[in-house]
Amino acid sequence: MEGAIVFVRSSVPRKYLLALVAALVIFINEVVQAQERSIPKSEAPGPVLVLSNSDTSQGVGFASFSVVNSDFPPGTLADPKQLVEVQWNATYYPESIMEDVKLCYSRPFSSQEDCRKILPNSSGILSDFNVQSFGNGSRVRIYHDVYGGTPRYTRPAGADSVVFKYSY
């Protein structure tokens, strides 16, 4: 049998190859089906009572944006979701002396907040919260700490807004 090539027929390698192909098909199918969606929200923060015309005593106005069941497409509520970014647009209180603004993210149904300082009357994108869980019950609040100003109640110039971008 010199120079002859002998092929051994075995079903074991074929089974492993078939399992590998099946796993790849499932993986590729999951990757292809991943979709990205957005949930836009908008709300005007409330008027703030100004207790003094100085920068030592602040009042707080805020807008709260909660994610609810109806924000998700039908049939996807139970699907795992990953937050991609939070786009934001913050208003300001034009009659105040000074204003500090922060954007805070809360995981689903949690009262703990993870906050980032932002500027009044500005917009931007944050991807700092991507490692945290996201879904029904997640929340963003934009807080406006308003210092001094006239008249007794200072009102915002407009509305705050956020867009939750996520994939599933």
Cite the ranges covered by each PLM segment.
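Short conserved micro-motifs at the rims of enzyme active sites and ligand-binding pockets
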Residues: 1-3, 153
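Bacterial N-terminal signal peptides that target proteins for export
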Residues: 3-18
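Bacterial N-terminal signal peptides
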Residues: 17-27
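Sec/Tat signal peptide C-region and signal peptidase I cleavage site
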Residues: 28-34
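Disulfide-rich extracellular domains of secreted proteins
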Residues: 35-168
